[in-house]
Amino acid sequence: MTRIGLLGGSFDPVHVAHIALADTARQFLGLDQVQLIPAANPWQRQPLKASAPHRLRMLELAIAGHPALAINPVEIERGGATYTADTVRALPGGPQYFWLLGTDQLQNFCTWRDWQDIAARIELAVATRPGASIAPPAELATWLAAHRRQLHELPFAPMAVSASDIRQRLAAGAATDGLLPEPVAAYIATHHLYR
């Protein structure tokens, strides 16, 4: 059975930690592919700074040279408010899917629309600091136990990089060396994004 990882996000902009997490998940979980899913309009976040075409192009540049990474534009193509549950319901049958999330997302997972449906349809893989254990919220832990489901741990050393910090640096004209894939940094400079 094909195993596919799913990494959703605004990717505003995509940065080195996104790519490192996708590569780590592919290797550690034995995934055939990791699909990066850019949000159209994420309901729990501030409005996006870069347009969908710019974010898609930056993703294309970031995954060049990573043949097991792909872009899944389902949320952008659907438009409107972005809910993971809708994305999961639209997945084609056949593969085994793993939704990749961080410990911060795990803690608010039970606030996601139709979270039980998400957890019933796909596997959840949580990026944790090496040696740390997963501590899901009580409501999720109870649901997982009742449905004989588990969380998959994905050891991932945290990286001191965030899209919001990168946007602030770019707006201030500060350096972003090592935070962005080089082709993405060049694209941002060429198109004067985040200024």
Curated annotation (Swiss-Prot):
Enzyme type, top EC level: transferase
Signal peptide bounds: none
Pathway(s) per entry: Cofactor biosynthesis; NAD(+) biosynthesis; deamido-NAD(+) from nicotinate D-ribonucleotide: step 1/1
GO MF annotations in UniProt: ATP binding; nicotinate-nucleotide adenylyltransferase activity
GO BP: any one term: NAD biosynthetic process
Known role: Catalyzes the reversible adenylation of nicotinate mononucleotide (NaMN) to nicotinic acid adenine dinucleotide (NaAD).
Name of the protein this chain belongs to: Probable nicotinate-nucleotide adenylyltransferase
